Amino acid sequence: MITHPQFDPVLISIGPLAVRWYALSYILGFILFTFLGRRRIAQGLSVFTKESLDDFLTWGILGVILGGRLGYVLFYKFSDYLAHPLDIFKVWEGGMSFHGGFLGVVIAIRLFGRKHGIGFLKLMDTVAPLVPLGLASGRIGNFINGELWGRVTDINAFWAMGFPQARYEDAEAAAHNPLWAEWLQQYGMLPRHPSQLYQFALEGICLFTVIWLFSKKQRSTGQVASLFLGGYGIFRFIAEFARQPDDYLGLLTLGLSMGQWLSVPMIVLGIVGFVRFGMKKQH
């Protein structure tokens, strides 16, 4: 079993100011978005100009941050924040939701499109290929922080990793499993899936490769966005089987996690949209 490297979450500290790796992962994501967006403009595969791309980035950042935070509040810890509403603003304590951030960006796309006279689906198609590498960057940030670890796996598995931050969860899990209790006593940690890296590979690298290659040719309006929607939903659904469910929610109906249930409508809408828009092209 490998032990998580235990990176210092703070990259640079100057007096009271601290630059954290997780914040840097978001910044890197936005930089990659801009770089890829300009490349698509040069290739003639974008509805953006260089100026409008920079303008949209501001809208997108607001959508990601506000949507991600509100999504986490509503989807994951609503009762806690209802009792302590001021905690909503304590973003430095963590708590962001991809699905909330996605909805925030969709709203930003809608508003931006109306302002600039760009069709909603065309703008969605343009934005979709620019997103996955940012998601990959965010998952690396999660890994550096040693958060969002995976479920318990076999002690002899080559991918098994111990997370010191999970000791409370390890003790709770071992209390219900004699074998895990032996492992915990012997190694001080339970072997877990490094699910952040799985999500980095699936939702980041694989999704980017599929969408980037697919969108290099002219496609029916809405197909690229649908591929992103369904592709992310499928990859997230798969990765969630290795990811530790949120301790305050656990597994829900049919033994699925909140992340999986939130991904189901993405999968359905993505598949339906991909087929429907593809049929329009054929006619």
From Swiss-Prot:
Annotated residues for binding of a 1,2-diacyl-sn-glycero-3-phospho-(1'-sn-glycerol): R139
Localization terms from the record: Cell inner membrane
**Molecular function via GO:** phosphatidylglycerol-prolipoprotein diacylglyceryl transferase activity
Q: How the protein sits in the membrane?
A: Multi-pass membrane protein
Say where the protein is mainly found. Answer: membrane
List the GO biological process terms.
lipoprotein biosynthetic process
GO cellular component terms, alphabetically, are: plasma membrane
The family database entries (NCBIfam families) matched by this protein are listed as: lgt
| Family per record | Belongs to the Lgt family.
Per the entry, what this protein does is: Catalyzes the transfer of the diacylglyceryl group from phosphatidylglycerol to the sulfhydryl group of the N-terminal cysteine of a prolipoprotein, the first step in the formation of mature lipoproteins.
Q: What is this protein called?
A: Phosphatidylglycerol--prolipoprotein diacylglyceryl transferase
Q: Which organism is it from?
A: Neisseria meningitidis serogroup B (strain ATCC BAA-335 / MC58)
